[in-house]
């Protein structure tokens, strides 16, 4: 997506006009314009020159965001609030002249304030003074007229058009009344003079412009605050780096750091670019990127990220990613892109905004005509029409969604939760089912020793020492768990080491044969006591892998290894279920291991034995029951992440640019999943509130201004209409800013949405059939049979075991035995019985 800066936009009608104009350019496949950030994202093959020309033809300005603007410091300067100071200056001058105008126009008549003798009974001089003061205020606020009439000329009227028409009508009619009064005074018609003098609306024109400027300033200040999170991220970017050149440290601008450069970071300094530690150790505070306040220990070989703070030790690092490739830059780009895209819910406001201003102009014209036809004076009828023009506010509609999206995505980024698009921020809160990959998501992804069971007469240290001697030459993933557990122990070198695939390990230590492996491998070498056998079977039921170790024909003991679940996983699952979300675990493990992990985590359903392509099929089946979010590590889960309604990559760390995911979680904590859903729901709720206020305001305000409620004694003059218009946008933006107070990790106020999926096992009539199958030899065979059976629409789940040679199928509707038999036998296996 190419990014552009757009100038000259003042309301939702402007952004809709630009979007429509660019959308017609050949080669443009998608266009999204953000009124909040005055930016535009365009996808397609169209040339930038053609896109800029289309924007200019629509009456606005555009420029491509170039490389010079792509550094965080340049982007930060671009986000600086330049608008508020300009509007403040306009407002100060406008208020100054307005006070003088109000003194002349109303002070003398209403409160008897003294006037210079020159104005005594000099009505023409009084009128000319008001005309002059109003003209000055109109010149000060000429932006409304230039923008409004320019948009009208391009047949794309906007909010400025409404203000300009209202102020022009009031000023024009007042000028006519002044000339008519002058003629009456020349004729000596005092009655006509007083009548025309009462038709002066100079103060209304000036007040409209001043009050709209007040609203614009409040809106600009509030809009500036919505980008605070993004600006705070940009401010984290270090400006300089201490690069090692010819053995000396040289301080250079961070933009000059090249990939492969070595740089030094002292305690208390920010790390300038992404890199890898070459020398030194330290604790690094990564809260700026992940939201996690606990420092992370770094040693040689560990990665470090830009904008994180070195707290305790000296580090020498090599730059691996610089400039726009750093983690910080990618996060900033994600937040900016999310703000530049549009949420699906915004389409409602966009459709209304496209016809809103022309409709309001028509209503104002009809209102004026109706009151004239009813016999009211021109001034009265014109006041009603002007009120309609100045109270109508397309800005409130246009800002309702983008301000909430900006605040929500910024708040997420500060807490390590990155939404790639506005649509992902909206859709995440609507999920009904969360599918969790087991390894690295529910579990740590790193096998650890959980139990040590020495045989009778063997000490724990003796068992660990022999296991260490054997495993230190192994490359098996489970060997790392044993080595970590035996850290601090020393073991002699073994000889004649052999790794027997699928069986175990053998070696010779001091003339004795050492061995280690599975239960089947052990049966041929040593006897296992009934007590130890019972304990290992219990460990297997818990999803742990027992490793048997022995010397010669003697069993030394058992070490159990497992990919243990993270401490916060059960709590995260519990929070998801309390939010009314069904939690499903997907894993390639066998059914027994998967069920054990699933029980510890507390999930609603376990789908085991699925390969990456099987996970994608499982997601497709789950999507038939509701909106699904898939949570995985973004590596082998890419097909499932892409298939799901919302793909969530967890524990991304520095690899934030995961293409398959819609949401990226910087931490490895599963608690960020309910936090992301909670934030999405709060943002969506805020958008609904904003849209309700915007529609309600216009639905009530326009009829009130037109005089529909005058029979009930309710009327509205143009000045109050302008004040209401000014406050409407301010209220919408202020409501969005309330999101900054939202505690996205506080589950005390979670609302449990009604979700029949969590009760489906109680409500759904199910039946089970057991298939006896020959030919299954391994977990891969289990996965093949399970995938084939669960692809059937009537099959809710299939539990397959190659050890027992059975498949237990849970059905939601009757299926003929021959159909089940054929489904399995088509995969090359034999069904001997179905019961």
Locate each region found by the language model.
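Membrane-embedded alpha-helical bundles of multi-pass transporters
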Residues: 110-124, 153, 172, 411, ...
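Conserved catalytic phosphorylation-site environment of P-type ATPases
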Residues: 289, 348, 383, 396-470, ...
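Conserved ATP-binding TGD loop and adjacent catalytic N/P-domain core of P-type ATPases
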Residues: 16, 29, 267, 431, ...
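ATP-driven catalytic headpiece of P-type ATPases
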Residues: 89, 308, 429-475, 503-584, ...
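Juxtamembrane coupling segments of multi-pass membrane pumps/enzymes
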Residues: 181-184, 190-191, 206-267, 298, ...
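Transmembrane helix-loop-helix hairpins at the membrane interface
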Residues: 86-240, 351, 718
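Flexible metal-binding regulatory segments at protein termini and peripheral loops
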Residues: 1-125, 223, 232, 248-251, ...
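Conserved cytosolic catalytic loops of P-type ATPases
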Residues: 26-49, 200, 231-325, 422-467, ...
């Amino acid at each position: 997506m190419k990014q552009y800066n757009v100038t000259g936009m003042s309301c939702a009608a402007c952004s809709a006009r630009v979007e429509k104009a660019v959308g017609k350019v050949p080669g443009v496949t998608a266009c999204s314009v953000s009124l909040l950030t005055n930016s535009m994202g365009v996808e397609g093959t169209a040339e930038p020159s053609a896109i800029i020309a289309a924007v200019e033809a629509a009456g606005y300005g555009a420029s491509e965001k170039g490389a010079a603007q792509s550094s965080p410091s340049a982007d930060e300067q671009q986000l600086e609030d330049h608008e508020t100071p300009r509007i403040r200056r306009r407002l100060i001058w406008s208020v100054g002249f307005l006070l003088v105008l109000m003194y002349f126009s109303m002070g003398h008549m209403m409160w008897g304030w003294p006037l210079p003798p020159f104005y005594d009974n000099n009505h023409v001089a009084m009128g000319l003074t008001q005309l002059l003061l109003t003209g000055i205020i109109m010149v000060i606020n000429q932006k409304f007229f230039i923008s409004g009439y320019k948009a009208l000329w391009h047949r794309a009227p906007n909010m400025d058009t409404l203000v300009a028409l209202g102020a022009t009508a009031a000023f024009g009619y007042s000028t006519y009344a002044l000339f008519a009064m002058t003629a009456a005074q020349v004729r000596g018609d005092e009655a006509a003079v007083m009548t025309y003098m009462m038709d002066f609306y100079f103060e209304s024109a000036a007040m409209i412009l001043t009050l709209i400027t007040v609203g614009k300033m409040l809106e600009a200040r509030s809009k500036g605050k919505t980008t605070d999170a993004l600006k705070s991220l940009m401010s984290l970017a270090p400006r300089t780096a201490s690069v090692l050149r010819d053995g000396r440290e040289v301080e250079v601008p961070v933009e000059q750091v090249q990939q492969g450069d070595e740089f030094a970071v002292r305690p208390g300094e920010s790390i300038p670019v992404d890199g890898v530690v070459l020398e030194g150790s330290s604790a690094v505070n990564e809260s700026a990127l992940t939201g996690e306040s606990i420092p992370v220990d770094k040693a040689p070989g560990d990665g470090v990220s830009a904008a994180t703070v070195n707290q305790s030790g000296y580090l020498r690092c090599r730059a691996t990613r610089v400039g726009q490739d750093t983690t910080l830059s990618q996060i900033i780009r994600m937040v900016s892109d999310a703000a530049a895209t549009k949420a699906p819910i915004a389409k409602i406001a966009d459709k209304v905004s496209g016809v809103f201003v022309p409709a309001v102009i028509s209503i104002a014209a009809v209102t004026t005509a109706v009151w004239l036809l009813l016999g009211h004076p021109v001034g009265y009828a014109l006041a009603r029409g002007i009120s309609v023009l100045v109270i109508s506010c397309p800005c409130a509609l246009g800002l309702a969604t983008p301000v909430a999206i900006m605040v929500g995505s910024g708040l997420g980024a500060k807490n390590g939760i990155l939404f790639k698009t506005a649509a992902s921020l909206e859709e995440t809160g609507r999920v009904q089912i969360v599918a969790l990959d087991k390894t690295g998501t529910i579990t740590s992804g790193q096998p650890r020793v959980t139990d040590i069971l020495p045989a009778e007469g063997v000490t724990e240290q003796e068992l660990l020492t022999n296991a260490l001697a054997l495993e230190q030459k192994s490359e098996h993933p489970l060997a790392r768990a044993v080595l970590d557990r035996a850290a601090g122990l020393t073991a002699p070198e073994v000889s004649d080491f052999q790794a027997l695939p699928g069986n175990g390990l053998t070696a010779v230590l001091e003339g004795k044969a050492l061995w280690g492996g599975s239960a089947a491998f052990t049966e041929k070498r040593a006897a296992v006591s009934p007590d130890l056998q019972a304990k290992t079977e219990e460990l297997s039921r818990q999803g742990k892998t027992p490793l048997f170790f022995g010397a010669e024909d003697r069993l030394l003991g058992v070490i159990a290894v497992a990919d243990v679940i993270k401490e916060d996983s059960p709590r995260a699952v519990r929070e998801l279920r309390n939010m009314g979300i069904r939690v499903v675990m997907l894993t390639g493990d066998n059914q027994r291991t998967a069920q054990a992990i699933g029980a510890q985590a507390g999930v609603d359903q376990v789908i085991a034995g699925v390969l990456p392509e099987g996970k994608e099929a499982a997601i497709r089946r789950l999507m038939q029951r509701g909106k699904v979010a898939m949570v995985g590590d973004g590596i082998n889960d890419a097909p499932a992440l892409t298939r799901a309604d919302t793909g969530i990559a967890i524990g991304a760390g520095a690899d934030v640019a995961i293409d398959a995911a819609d949401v990226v979680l910087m931490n490895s904590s599963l608690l960020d999943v309910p936090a992301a859903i909670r934030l999405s729901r709060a943002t969506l709720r805020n958008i609904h509130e904003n849209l309700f206020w915007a529609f309600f305001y216009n639905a009530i305000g326009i009829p009130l201004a037109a005089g529909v409620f005058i029979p009930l004694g309710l009327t509205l003059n143009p000045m109050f209409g302008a004040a209401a218009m000014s406050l409407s946008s301010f209220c919408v933006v202020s409501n969005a800013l309330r999101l900054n107070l939202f505690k996205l990790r506080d589950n005390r106020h979670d609302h449990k949405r009604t979700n029949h999926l969590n009760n489906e096992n109680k409500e759904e009539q199910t039946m089970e059939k057991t298939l006896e199958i020959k030919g299954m030899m391994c977990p891969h065979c289990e996965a093949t049979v399970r995938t084939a059976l669960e692809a059937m629409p009537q099959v809710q789940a299939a539990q397959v075991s190659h050890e027992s040679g059975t498949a237990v199928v849970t059905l939601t509707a009757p299926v003929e035995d021959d159909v089940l038999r054929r489904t399995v036998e088509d995969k090359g296996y034999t069904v001997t019985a179905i019961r």
